[in-house]
């Protein structure tokens, strides 16, 4: 078996393990979202309050720290394992110590400034006539903000395992979180039923504590599940505070561009969240943040099942090629992952476009959500247009990260974020229709990735001359020709 064939077999095997865990986790996540829609609806103020409180900490983590952990640390750990005499053990100990301290400080600051943070994401809710709903949102946000720390620890442990080629645990652990969350909403349904959101009133204090506290508990459980796997992988952590002159400076130098990258994404996310918040601040029901997030949840499912798993398996291998100076190997790994991903995701994007109505009706059209599921269908159709360029862009960026290059992704993100912001403002502001706000914002998101992938391909090809361009276009064209007739029928 050639090295290329072995690499392909290894990539497929690792992807299968991760995809199976991701599939179970995403299915349970969808069940959770369906239960939320059944209990609280899709466009009510109660469901908006819960989702703003619960998703803002997650968004902050993924944008402020998650990108650094996912895309900077793995290549750095692989480099340390390859070159350090102790196999990278001391380096990883220092990485964990430094990031846990930083995450702890960040969590304290964000929790103390919760009113300011939440006003950045949902300014329309600070209006005087929304005072009761704003107070309910803040209570839930205070309870949810500690999730930021536990998300950080979870992803940090997960990346240590990934760098040791132990990919499965990180993809399977979120199942525990979803089980806890489903149990919490089942308890809420048993106590208060599914009519509370229709009253237009904010959550009571016990309701807020149950839902927000349950969400935070789920993240804690998800993190604890990883600890036995870390021990089984032969890793034992020892805090190390001798951080100077140990190579961490290089890691944080690489990470600074990722901080800029995520800062741009954060600003656009805030803009989108604020535009979405207007849908339910002006009326009791509209296609706001929850509709946008639920459509995104369905849209991202095929990407999460395949592309994320492919990229996670690809990154350590591509990083090893990059460390060895083998740019052809990096190009081959990227191309292999891209062809595998698009072979499945282009048909998936067409299917989402055609089947948006029945899929969203089945998932979110029951109970309290029966009257407003169609908002999600419209947003899902808008998202579906951008699935393929989003996937290609995602894999292209991993090639840059494997080559220890985070500066170029930051510069490329300027174009994507700028296009997203401009399109969001152009599509959201001129029309005063609260039922289509989420769909217009989703379309803006999709259009921005067409801009991004076009620019990124030419920039990456300068560094990887063997990266195919015309062959990729022909591959996509053949897939489209094979898929469209089936969709029409």
Predicted regions mapped to residue ranges:
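Membrane-embedded alpha-helical bundles of multi-pass transporters/translocases
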Residues: 1-489
């Amino acid at each position: 078996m050639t090295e290329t064939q072995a690499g392909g077999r290894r990539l497929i095997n690792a992807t299968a393990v991760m995809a199976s865990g991701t599939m179970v986790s995403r299915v349970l996540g969808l069940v959770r979202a369906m239960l939320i829609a059944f209990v609280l609806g899709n466009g009510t103020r109660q469901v908006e309050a819960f989702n703003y409180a619960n998703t803002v900490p997650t968004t902050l983590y993924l944008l402020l720290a998650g990108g650094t952990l996912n895309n900077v640390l793995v290549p750095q750990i692989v480099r340390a394992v390859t070159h350090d005499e102790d196999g990278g053990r001391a380096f990883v100990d220092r990485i964990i110590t430094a990031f846990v301290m930083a995450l702890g400080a960040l969590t304290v600051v964000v929790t103390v400034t919760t009113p300011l943070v939440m006003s950045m994401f949902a300014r329309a809710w600070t209006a005087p006539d929304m005072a009761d709903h704003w107070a309910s949102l803040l209570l839930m946000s205070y309870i949810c903000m500690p999730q930021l720390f536990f998300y950080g620890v979870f992803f940090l442990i997960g990346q240590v395992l990934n760098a040791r080629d132990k990919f499965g645990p990180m993809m399977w652990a979120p199942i525990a979180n979803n089980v806890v969350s489903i149990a919490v909403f089942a308890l809420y349904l048993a106590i208060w039923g599914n009519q509370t959101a229709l009253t237009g009133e904010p959550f009571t204090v016990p309701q807020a504590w149950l839902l927000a506290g349950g969400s935070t508990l789920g993240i804690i459980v998800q993190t604890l599940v990883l600890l036995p796997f870390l021990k089984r992988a032969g890793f034992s952590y020892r805090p190390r505070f001798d951080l100077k002159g140990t190579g961490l400076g290089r890691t944080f130098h690489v990470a600074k561009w990722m901080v800029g990258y995520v800062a741009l994404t954060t600003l656009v996310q805030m803009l989108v969240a604020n535009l979405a918040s207007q849908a339910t601040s002006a009326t009791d029901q509209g296609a706001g943040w929850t509709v946008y997030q639920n459509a995104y949840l369905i849209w991202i499912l095929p990407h999460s099942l395949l592309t994320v798993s492919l990229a996670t398996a690809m990154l350590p291998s591509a990083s090893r090629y990059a460390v060895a100076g083998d740019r052809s190997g990096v190009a081959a790994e990227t191309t292999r992952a891209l062809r595998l991903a698009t072979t499945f995701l282009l048909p998936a994007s067409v299917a989402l476009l055609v089947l948006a109505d029945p899929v969203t009706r089945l998932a979110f059209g029951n109970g309290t959500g029966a009257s407003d599921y169609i908002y999600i269908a419209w947003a899902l159709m808008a998202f579906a247009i951008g699935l393929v360029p989003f996937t290609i862009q995602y894999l292209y960026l991993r090639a840059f990260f494997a080559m220890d290059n985070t500066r170029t992704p930051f510069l490329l993100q300027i174009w994507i974020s700028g296009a997203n912001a401009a399109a969001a403002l152009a599509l959201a502001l001129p029309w005063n229709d609260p039922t289509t706000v989420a769909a217009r914002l989703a379309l803006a998101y999709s259009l921005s990735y067409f801009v991004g992938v076009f620019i990124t391909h030419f920039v990456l090809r300068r560094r990887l001359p063997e990266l195919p361009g015309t062959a990729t276009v022909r591959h996509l064209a053949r897939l489209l020709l094979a898929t469209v007739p089936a969709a029409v029928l």
